[in-house]
Amino acid sequence: MVALPMVLVLLLVLSRGESELDAKIPSTGDATEWRNPHLSMLGSCQPAPSCQKCILSHPSCAWCKQLNFTASGEAEARRCARREELLARGCPLEELEEPRGQQEVLQDQPLSQGARGEGATQLAPQRVRVTLRPGEPQQLQVRFLRAEGYPVDLYYLMDLSYSMKDDLERVRQLGHALLVRLQEVTHSVRIGFGSFVDKTVLPFVSTVPSKLRHPCPTRLERCQSPFSFHHVLSLTGDAQAFEREVGRQSVSGNLDSPEGGFDAILQAALCQEQIGWRNVSRLLVFTSDDTFHTAGDGKLGGIFMPSDGHCHLDSNGLYSRSTEFDYPSVGQVAQALSAANIQPIFAVTSAALPVYQELSKLIPKSAVGELSEDSSNVVQLIMDAYNSLSSTVTLEHSSLPPGVHISYESQCEGPEKREGKAEDRGQCNHVRINQTVTFWVSLQATHCLPEPHLLRLRALGFSEELIVELHTLCDCNCSDTQPQAPHCSDGQGHLQCGVCSCAPGRLGRLCECSVAELSSPDLESGCRAPNGTGPLCSGKGHCQCGRCSCSGQSSGHLCECDDASCERHEGILCGGFGRCQCGVCHCHANRTGRACECSGDMDSCISPEGGLCSGHGRCKCNRCQCLDGYYGALCDQCPGCKTPCERHRDCAECGAFRTGPLATNCSTACAHTNVTLALAPILDDGWCKERTLDNQLFFFLVEDDARGTVVLRVRPQEKGADHTQAIVLGCVGGIVAVGLGLVLAYRLSVEIYDRREYSRFEKEQQQLNWKQDSNPLYKSAITTTINPRFQEADSPTL
């Protein structure tokens, strides 16, 4: 029978999404999602009608609970703003309500090695309470120490189909050697054994009675009846018991190429009590020489019920319901292994290796090794895989409640080096014994949780875990809460967070009027301009108890001011450097402009030699606005004016090299300059580039010191290159190249023409059709005469 590795690889790739979703630790509880339709995590802080809605609307929002904080006509929603804005508007710091998320470490035993790996503390802290404000992340520090000699449980799961006959002989002598090698890295190790073949129905196994009793090819061989999974030996530290039980095993047989290994893996992970797993590092060694059946294959044998994910071992250790349930999916296997904290090691032959390599990508913290044809290298393969798995630390979480997001940063090599963020897990590779690695776990909630949630973090393959108690901060803790407060019109409402909550039938900011007075003309007159007939509250609010309660960003006695109508700079109100009040930007210190777009600094306006804008302009927004006739960033240029380089060229040359037009009176003509030689590299375009009369190239930089003296930093002279020879040779070479090109082009065109004509001639020759014909004047010398009597004699007589 021929294996189908490529088909299985394709199936594995298609099931990747399923396994990645399924292979999470089971949830400890589900939380119901609750959302406030007024809230959004996007944008900046916006006004909100209450303290609770304010702190939920955006993580940057704060609430001012000071009494009478809002101005006349200003909505109470304006109490909700950024901390800086509220302080700028006069809210005392002690009156700010700005709850922040926090974390509290409840249990933090220090990391320790323990005695021979037993009792080691490898993960810290152990329990943390985290309170999340929606939209605000909280970061946890999780430390892991790789302890020496951590205990190990190893379960050897072997394919006993007939093709594994040679391997079984080798495994019968494996127990002692495997224990000895494992005891080199840990002082507490136990091993167990299980085997598998396939489901005992067609087309996987022959159901002919004689074949069910003896499925091997020849009668002389020792052979057992086929089975799905058989748990042979529970985990033990007795190597002789392992070798004795394995020695009693014999191979079996099946029909098709893939084996029923998934059934065996699932039962070994689910039946923890029967297998005898301890709460230590758990390894499952899976050996086979072929691929595996997966979910859906059972339908070929009339098995339609999906695997139920429960243990079904009978008293003899056999999987008793293998013919009732289909094979498990990759996702089910990955989830069961992850939930049981088991690390699988797939030891397979070269023919099946590509399939199991793809499978390993879908199962967290698994390893694959190539098994020799007779399993002679299985001990070394197990040791290599164990060392690889134990040196890889993978931090993973249980299922998250709706609305909570998590990300990881891994700090593997030191405090300065952090790996990139990952959404699903944190991982450090090649962790040495006694080395401590750190993970930064960031938690963020988008909305409130109806109840606390327990989140579990653990390092795969290790028994310890960190329990995180997740709470959400969804209300204000105002200390001024007062029922029937005197501030609210002598007890007509309750005071909470600086705002009156009126009793039934009462209205107004201070509950000062009743519902019956709501439409009184006298009250409405207070919401219009004197002798005005326009809409109440300028159409930007509603009239309540004779006062305007403005909506949105409007304010003022009649809501006449719009605090969102100020000019914007780069799309931001007041450029982000001021506060908009009644259509006018009130800029922060050192900012000017209608949209606070200008900085008060003038550094960019000071020229090296001419002061502010070279004396030919004024500085506005840290940029020079030049007078008529001048231009340039510093107003230092004009039509017909010399550039700074031209003005100072002669002084730079005579001061540095004692040459040039001013060489004889340099000290007098250049008294206002200070020339120095500079060996610094030329970093920008501010350097002047000039030549002396003898073609010497030099550079200099014009600067201005604090005393108003012009400083010229001159680089040493550089001999100008003579390009005459290069120009002449280039011209000659160009002419020659053009001539050769023309000749070659002509010859090429002639060649193409000749080839085309010759090809046409050959084609015409092939189409000639010479016909053979006779001369019409020619008469043959042969005459043929037919005897009619001869023809009658040949005819039969009737």
Curated annotation (Swiss-Prot):
This is Integrin beta-7. Its main location: membrane. The gene is ITGB7. Residues 44-92 form the PSI domain. It holds the Pfam family Integrin_b_cyt. Induction: Induced by TGFB1. GO terms for biological process: cell adhesion; cell adhesion mediated by integrin; cell-cell adhesion; cell-matrix adhesion; cell-matrix adhesion involved in ameboidal cell migration; heterotypic cell-cell adhesion; immune response in gut-associated lymphoid tissue; integrin-mediated signaling pathway. Residues 20-723 are extracellular. SMART domains: INB, Integrin_b_cyt, Integrin_B_tail, PSI. Ca(2+) 1 binds at S163, D166, D167, D289, E373. GO terms for molecular function: cell adhesion molecule binding; integrin binding; metal ion binding; virus receptor activity. It is found in: Cell membrane. Keywords: Calcium, Cell adhesion, Cell membrane, Disulfide bond, EGF-like domain, Glycoprotein, Host cell receptor for virus entry, Integrin, Magnesium, Membrane, Metal-binding, Phosphoprotein, Receptor, Repeat, Signal, Transmembrane, Transmembrane helix. Disulfide bonds join C51-C476, C54-C80, C64-C91, C216-C223, C271-C311, C412-C428, C448-C474, C478-C497, C488-C500, C502-C511, C513-C545, C527-C543, C537-C548, C550-C559, C561-C582, C566-C580, C574-C585, C587-C596, C598-C621, C605-C619, C613-C624, C626-C635, C638-C641, C645-C688, C651-C670, C654-C666. Heterodimer of an alpha and a beta subunit. ITGB7/beta-7 associates with either ITGA4/alpha-4 or ITGAE/alpha-E. Integrin ITGA4/ITGB7 interacts with MADCAM1. Integrin ITGA4/ITGB7 interacts with VCAM1 and fibronectin. Interacts with FLNA (via filamin repeats 4, 9, 12, 17, 19, 21, and 23). The lineage of its organism: Eukaryota, Metazoa, Chordata, Craniata, Vertebrata. Ca(2+) 2 binds at D198, N254, D256, P258, E259. Glycans are attached at N68, N279, N434, N477, N531, N590, N665, N674. The modification Phosphotyrosine is found at Y778. The chain crosses the membrane at residues 724-746. One of its GO terms (cellular component) is focal adhesion. Belongs to the integrin beta chain family. Residues 747-798 are cytoplasmic. Residues 478-512, 513-560, 561-597, 598-636 form the I-EGF domain. Integrin ITGA4/ITGB7 (alpha-4/beta-7) (Peyer patches-specific homing receptor LPAM-1) is an adhesion molecule that mediates lymphocyte migration and homing to gut-associated lymphoid tissue (GALT). Integrin ITGA4/ITGB7 interacts with the cell surface adhesion molecules MADCAM1 which is normally expressed by the vascular endothelium of the gastrointestinal tract. Also interacts with VCAM1 and fibronectin, an extracellular matrix component. It recognizes one or more domains within the alternatively spliced CS-1 region of fibronectin. (Microbial infection) Binds to HIV-1 gp120, thereby allowing the virus to enter GALT, which is thought to be the major trigger of AIDS disease. Interaction would involve a tripeptide L-D-I in HIV-1 gp120. Coiled coil: none annotated. Residues 1-19 form the signal peptide.
